[in-house]
Amino acid sequence: MGRDTRSRSRSAGRRGRRRQSQSGSRSRSRSHGRRNRRRREDEGRRRRRRRSRERRSDSEEERWQRSGMRSRSPPRPKWHSRDGSSQSDSGEEQSRGQWARRRRRARSWSPSSSASSSASPGRSQSPRAAAAALSQQQSLQERLRLREERKQQEELMKAFETPEEKRARRLAKKEAKERKKREKMGWGEEYMGYTNTDNPFGDNNLLGTFIWNKALEKKGISHLEEKELKERNKRIQEDNRLELQKVKQLRLEREREKAMREQELEMLQREKEAEHFKTWEEQEDNFHLQQAKLRSKIRIRDGRAKPIDLLAKYISAEDDDLAVEMHEPYTFLNGLTVADMEDLLEDIQVYMELEQGKNADFWRDMTTITEDEISKLRKLEASGKGPGERREGVNASVSSDVQSVFKGKTYNQLQVIFQGIEGKIRAGGPNLDMGYWESLLQQLRAHMARARLRERHQDVLRQKLYKLKQEQGVESEPLFPILKQEPQSPSRSLEPEDAAPTPPGPSSEGGPAEAEVDGATPTEGDGDGDGEGEGEGEAVLMEEDLIQQSLDDYDAGRYSPRLLTAHELPLDAHVLEPDEDLQRLQLSRQQLQVTGDASESAEDIFFRRAKEGMGQDEAQFSVEMPLTGKAYLWADKYRPRKPRFFNRVHTGFEWNKYNQTHYDFDNPPPKIVQGYKFNIFYPDLIDKRSTPEYFLEACADNKDFAILRFHAGPPYEDIAFKIVNREWEYSHRHGFRCQFANGIFQLWFHFKRYRYRR
């Protein structure tokens, strides 16, 4: 039993080993068959490649022969086998190659080719052209050789590459083709690396063309073929590309225009800043001028005034209607030293720069006079030290005569003398003492400046006197009276040379006296004659005036006032009823009886009450809005009048998030209007029981503002103001007040503040 089982197991084992050996031999035979089949496929592939290379080489040789390059055949490529077992081809291939070479040789040595080759030297024009053709042929051969080598390397690389490398090469080639296609389609760089398998859109057909059949059917072009659709899409893409270019060009043009506008705005801003800077400079100069005047006032008040302070006070008194200076400005130089006058010249220059030419003539004349006084003082100092070594232009004996000639002359007369001296200096001459005449000219300039200041001082005094008489109601003569000129007799007419006396010469001793006599005698005669004529005219005129005045007083000698009509009243006249006048009189008597300031009127009390509690953030607000076309029924009984008012506007800073971010307490934000306080004065209301009212109306021209109108009743007209249109705060805790007491209507309110809440 055990023997049978062992024999069965052995036989089963032998059968199993036999099956395994058979299966192993079958597998080995299958693998060997696959290897042989692969080898045969490779050999067939290599054979096809050799044939294709031979065909390409034959075609290239034929092209060489056609181009005339038969002297040298192109190099034959040496093709290598992949396995490297044998370097020679089969007999059939060798015979085919020999036959091809024989055929090419026969073609190359044909009579036509020899004739063309023999005729080609005859066609060559020059050795230089032949050398150029030879170099061109050599460069062409070099390019062909390089291309053949590159092709050989590519073929060799393809022959030895593995299937994975081949697959990678084809994929790279395909990707390059797709990339070129995407570039042609106008894809950007960010979408250039997307593929069907690698894209963030999850689209497996990303690179494929999407065909929207429904849209094509709707457009009626579903019958078109794929090629026609592609052409149509290309045209659409080209149109889109052109449109994008136009849009880009327009965008660039807009950016250019924007840059130009910004540049223009910058230039305008610079001009505004320049104007602002100019205004700031003017304000700064004005500030320094005011400070200089303030310092002058302080020094004058403390009794330590400088000459420039007195001159500044004099020139500022010309603009003042009440201040009067009785002395000429050059009298302030009396008693000054040379150092004081030099300081005065510097101060005058400062005032001329600060005033910017306002009183340039005055300061220029004062400079001339000061320089003349300085030169005189220096001459005195030099003469006090010892005898002068050089001649001073005018002799001391002649100087007094010159001063007497210049003294008492008007500015116009001195100007005539000045022109005559200048003409004499320009004319010149051999016996002309130039130093004398130049010194005389310098003195004459100082006398002209004094005469101009004297005439200006007289004009200012005359104008001040005229204004004072007008204010006091005193009748006076006109400021510029019309003088009646009487015809002069021939005996009293002056000759031209006597009208302008000539100053004495440097060498004449009796010249000054003669000139003075010649110039003074006719003048005195004329003066006497004029005085007599004027005295007679004034006497006649005064008598006529007295007679006319007495007649007027006789006609107007009434002690009761004349009754006036309504048309004769001025527009701003206030008409009072007898009862109202009596009431005012009694009120005035009561005010005199009570203790206190009797001169304080009801309006003063009103303004004093209205100004109480006025803070720093409040300012007076008196801009009234005109009301036109308003007619009152009581206008025929009472004369309408405007009420008095004292309004205040409350301004302040609003520290919201924006202002807290961009401003601080040192650089605060701009102030805004936060409220108003209206105080309207109605002391003479006819109906004391009617309370004044206010009406808030919309502003027609601007929605940001509103019209606040107050209505009280006779005899007061309505009054309106333009305010900011914001919501009011009606709570008394926030300062709202609307009351009428003691003839004063008060309306105080603040605007609501909108706070940011999350």
From Swiss-Prot:
An annotated GO cellular component: nuclear speck
Bias (Basic and acidic residues): 55-65, 155-178
Disordered, as annotated region: 1-140, 155-181, 477-536
One GO molecular-function entry: RNA binding
Modified residues (Phosphotyrosine): 559
Known partners and oligomeric status: Interacts (via N-terminal domain) with NFKBIL1; the interaction occurs in a pro-inflammatory-independent manner. Does not interact with RELA NF-kappa-B subunit. Identified in the spliceosome C complex. Interacts with SF3B1. Interacts with SDE2. Interacts with SRRM2. Interacts with DHX8. Interacts with isoform 2 of TRIM39 (via domain B box-type).
Function: Plays a role in pre-mRNA splicing by facilitating excision of a subset of introns. Required for the splicing of CDCA5/Sororin, a regulator of sister chromatid cohesion. Involved in the regulation of innate immune response. Acts as a negative regulator of Toll-like receptor, interferon-regulatory factor (IRF) and canonical NF-kappa-B signaling pathways. Contributes to the regulation of transcriptional activation of NF-kappa-B target genes in response to endogenous pro-inflammatory stimuli.
Other facts: Antigen recognized by autologous antibody in patients with renal-cell carcinoma.
Family: Belongs to the CACTIN family.
The protein's name: Splicing factor Cactin
